[in-house]
């Protein structure tokens, strides 16, 4: 399985011969990195089999970068509105949307879904979902790999909860160190000093992980 970071909080996931772009096209927002022109071209030259978005904030979904797919590609585009309940199968990979609550309390009515992708491995892509809501979700399959924002690793209580879910974490939604005005990197590094048997990756933009 390959995971390439293509956006602030998004990745291109390749598993079992299927490629799925998850929140993988974004605009510049504050200190967070946008999808670069080179990555946008790479994705258009080799389009993924599907695109999925957890919500439509600009740091997770770029309307401008999404437009060429809607104009030129016949592949289905999946997002919160088109996947409210059911599971979709693409090749040997199933994608199950799970209704989830966005971090914080500023937008209580914001539509947000997370995705469970199952093939030879089970991957959770949670978007900006608040972490504590997963604590007692015994109805969901446990992930082999969790792809999550920095908020899943900036407090010990949350990090311990993550450790009860999975042993492999890919952390996204972190700004570059040089523009990190809120100390997010310091909080994450302090929290994750003792990783136990947890494997943690924090990929750079464009970096490809083989897991």
Feature annotation, model-predicted:
Residues 28-29, 56-61, 83-88, 103-105, ...:
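Active-site environment of divalent metal-dependent phosphoester hydrolases
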Residues 21-24, 47-63, 78-80, 124-129, ...:
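Active-site neighborhood of phospho(di)ester-bond hydrolases with catalytic His/Asp-centered motifs
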Residues 4, 82-91, 109, 160-211:
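Binuclear metal-ion centers of metallo-dependent hydrolases, dominated by the metallo-beta-lactamase
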Residues 104-164:
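Active-site-proximal loop/helix segments of hydrolase catalytic cores
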Residues 37-91:
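Active-site HxH/HxHxD metal-binding segment of metal-dependent hydrolases
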Residues 12-52, 63-65, 105, 130-141:
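Pre-active-site segment of Zn-dependent metallo-hydrolases
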Residues 43-46, 67-73, 138-142, 160-166:
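Short, conserved loop/helix-junction motifs that constitute active-site signature segments
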Residues 1-21, 26-29, 35-38, 98, ...:
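Zn-dependent metallo-beta-lactamase
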């Amino acid at each position: 399985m390959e995971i390439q970071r293509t956006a602030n909080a998004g990745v291109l996931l390749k598993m079992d011969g299927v490629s799925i772009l998850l929140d993988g096209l974004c605009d510049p927002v504050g200190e967070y990195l946008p999808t670069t022109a080179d990555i946008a071209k790479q994705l258009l030259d080799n389009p993924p089999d599907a695109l999925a978005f957890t919500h439509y904030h600009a740091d997770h979904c770029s309307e401008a970068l999404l437009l060429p797919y809607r104009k030129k590609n016949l592949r289905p585009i999946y997002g919160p509105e088109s996947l409210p309940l059911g599971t979709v199968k693409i090749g040997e990979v199933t994608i199950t949307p799970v209704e989830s609550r966005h971090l914080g309390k500023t937008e209580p009515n914001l539509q947000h879904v997370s995705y469970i992708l199952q093939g030879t491995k089970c991957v959770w892509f949670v978007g900006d979902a608040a972490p504590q809501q997963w604590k007692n979700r015994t109805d969901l399959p446990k992930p082999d790999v969790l792809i999550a924002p920095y908020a899943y690793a900036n407090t010990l209580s949350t990090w311990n909860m993550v450790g009860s879910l999975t042993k492999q974490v890919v952390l996204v939604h972190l700004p570059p160190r040089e523009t990190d005005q809120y100390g997010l990197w310091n909080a994450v590094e302090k929290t994750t000093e003792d990783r136990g048997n947890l494997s943690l990756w924090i990929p750079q933009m464009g970096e490809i992980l083989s897991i």
